[in-house]
């Protein structure tokens, strides 16, 4: 929760984290002096659909390639463990699309657009 806040990400409830984190399909963390300074997760149904979420690096550790290391770990797990034809998506905030493009992700527009709803 502290890393999300430090990186300027939208806050999540403690209750939501307690339910959601154990359902992570694959996760990656980067530690510095026993502190988590970077993270990323893959969530999904385990067969057809996967989403990369929670990619962030603490501002004091940005610009060192940690985001790229996290993405490389997540993409490697996806390539190794998902069935053929799986669909992997993510939402790119700000300039993060530049990182994701390095791993083969492409905008879906104009064929489709991402949408969200917060109940």
What are these regions, as identified by a protein language model?
Residues 1-15:
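Short amphipathic alpha-helix that is part of the acyltransferase structural core
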Residues 18-29, 84-86:
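A short helix-loop-beta-strand connector motif used in the catalytic cores of GNAT acetyltransferases and
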Residues 29, 35-44, 48-51, 56:
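Conserved beta-strand in the GNAT
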Residues 44-52, 62, 84, 110-111:
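A conserved beta-turn-beta hairpin within the catalytic core of GNAT-like acetyltransferases
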Residues 61, 65-73:
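Conserved acetyl-CoA pyrophosphate-binding loop and the N-cap/start of the following alpha-helix
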Residues 71, 78-92:
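Conserved GNAT acetyl-CoA-binding A-motif
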Residues 85, 89-91, 101, 106-119:
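Conserved catalytic-core motifs of GNAT/GCN5-like acyltransferases
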